[in-house]
Amino acid sequence: MGIHTAWQDATPLVLFVGLIPISDRDRESFQEFDPKAWFGTQAKQVFVLDDPQRASRVVAEAFFQAQQGRPGPVIVGLPEDILHREFTGTIHPPIQVADGALSDADLNHLSRELTQAQRPLIFAGGPRWTPESAAAITQFAEDNHIPIIQDFRAADRVPFESPANAGWLGYGRDPRAAQLLEEASLVLEVGAVLGDVPTDGYTLRQSTDARNIVISPDTSLRGHSVALERHIVASPVAFTSGLERLNVGGAEAREEWFNTAHANHLDFATLPEPAQYRAGKEGTAHMETVFAALHKQLPKDSLYTFGAGNHCIWAQRFLRSTVYPSQFSVRNGSMGYSVPAAVATKLQFPERTVVTIAGDGEYLMNGQELATALQYGAPFLIIVMSNGEFGTIRDHQKKHFPDRVSGTQLVNPDFAAVARGFGAHGELVTEDSRVPDAIARALAAINNDGVPALINVITDQDLSLPID
């Protein structure tokens, strides 16, 4: 699952896999498998090191392949007997990964087309961004009145409050975001491509007359599904480093287009007032209350992780990113990502507050990684949206087989008590009035005691998604 996640998330990853001795192959040996057959459909490349003298070259090539173009996972198989043999060759230096560049012809073309476009739109996402490149494209878009709409699970390339922020595409998106994509006279795809999820299953922007320019280091443009006018082979870093050489005019003519896109984004991300909440069952709290309290109490540069499920729609819609990177999630719908990702994120960014939003079904997948967080001193906040079901799967059942509940109901443990058993701070919340203080105590445990904190929020099954 981790390899497939890295494949669809375009995450550079090198995995070294221990294998049986060469002499034991094809004999149904204990734990024998063929790594090329096993990983071949979801890795960029699979190596099997049968000669120790090739070790340095293979390792250098593996790290290069994992990073170049569209990043992804690379597998290196290590037969047991090879590991015991001596390497006497020359150490191969790292292979430089090219970022690509904008030619003068590219710059002239982009300057002309963006100036002439009445309704240009930047679609941003994908790998190989830096804080500097994210800031640069935001400034460019603000200066030239070009809205930026972000890819599925990539809503941290542009600060939430930037006037260039036009929201995001993918599951749970604002209907007006789809309209924006359809109405754009020119789309500049930077780092990401308009594939399955952002086009609502290959239904948006499918006209062969649609004008789309792609900025991507991936020469194959894997996943791209719309008409292509021009492909500039460059990473987001290479592209944004050339923005100062672009000469784009006509910003005033795009002001209404620009402002409307941002206003719609803000409207969609605004929480309702408590008087507008949908009635929930007794003994439950509203996720709207949770996010309202998080807005008030979290530092602006907080980092967020979430996995797969209905809880992600809440996180994607209402969490507010201000700097890149600040959002970590998965694009392949694999559950169990949120807690391990929070551990890794806190270790990578120890000075920043890390928050994970998890559903109860998703938390049950890998919640035991709290032990790892305690072991390595990685305190973070966990909000468990606990409604006693696999919500996304149940929603599909309601739609297609409304009277057949099958395999989606959960009997949960007391998540707060389990967290305390690990040595973390744990609280149970069953009503809105307890939410703000529970979050305050949890953050105090993180900041003062240095331990993770979990808040188990009991929610109504009928309120598993935000109101449209």
Walk through the language-model features, giving the residues of each.
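N-terminal alpha/beta PP-like core and its mobile active-site loop of ThDP/TPP-dependent enzymes
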Residues: 1-253, 300, 379-382, 414, ...
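Flexible, glycine/charged-enriched surface loops at secondary-structure junctions
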Residues: 71-74, 250-264, 450-454
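Short acidic/His/Gly/Ser-rich catalytic and metal-binding motifs that mark active-site loops
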Residues: 84-88, 157-160, 266-268, 313-316, ...
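Active-site diphosphate/adenylate-binding microenvironment
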Residues: 262-340, 345, 351
